Amino acid sequence: MATPKSFRDNLAEILKTHDFRTVELEFRLGFQAPGEFITNINKHVWTTAKEKLGTPAQELVMVDKYIRSTPGESSRYVVFPDGQGYWEHKKKVAKETTTGGKYGVRSAFSLERRENGKPPVSFRMQRTKYRTTFVKGPWKIDFTRVESIPATDRDCESTYEIEVELYDMFYLFEKELDIIIQEGNKLVQSIVM
């Protein structure tokens, strides 16, 4: 039986066979629950960490209307306050979870594709995201308050998320993948220390 590929090896393979600009490499804080990784952070911890980072590079509100979402793929229409929007299709390729410390880290990478198009007539869930972004070198640090509104008669839910994403994808050509993955993990963990 073949040994499964490591997170790093999966990423290296995808970078060889796909346009690097379609790859999203991210690190999210959270905790491991039975069967799933929860990315909701304590509101006080989230607010305190956000205040430590100083002046943000960007603040924005966007609405995601999901028409399809499975554990491995999602399609959503993203709308900005000016009414402009686009379709985003995301295919999750690999993930790994590191526990220990105050919070665990979910490292993941996906293939993303964006396209113009009309908004959906119906959707299964809507998420309004209030995002504050900080930039640190090639990394983007997002603090996002998310209001999830299911299309069914369930309650609205607010969550507080912290994500570090490799923003400057050319960084992949400057350092070895192991170092980049380590850097992303360390950066996201340092935010709440």
Swiss-Prot record:
InterPro entries per the UniProt record, alphabetical: CYTH-like_dom_sf, mRNA_triPase_Cet1_sf
Swiss-Prot/TrEMBL catalytic activity: a 5'-end triphospho-ribonucleoside in mRNA + H2O = a 5'-end diphospho-ribonucleoside in mRNA + phosphate + H(+)
Essential cofactor(s): Mn(2+)
GO MF annotation terms: polynucleotide 5'-phosphatase activity
EC number(s) on file: 3.6.1.74
Keywords: Hydrolase, mRNA capping, mRNA processing
Domain of life (superkingdom): Viruses
Record carries keyword Hydrolase: yes
Purpose of the protein: Catalyzes the first stes of cap formation: by removing the gamma-phosphate from the 5'-triphosphate end of nascent mRNA to yield a diphosphate end.
Protein name: 5'RNA triphosphatase A449R
Lineage: Viruses, Varidnaviria, Bamfordvirae, Nucleocytoviricota, Megaviricetes
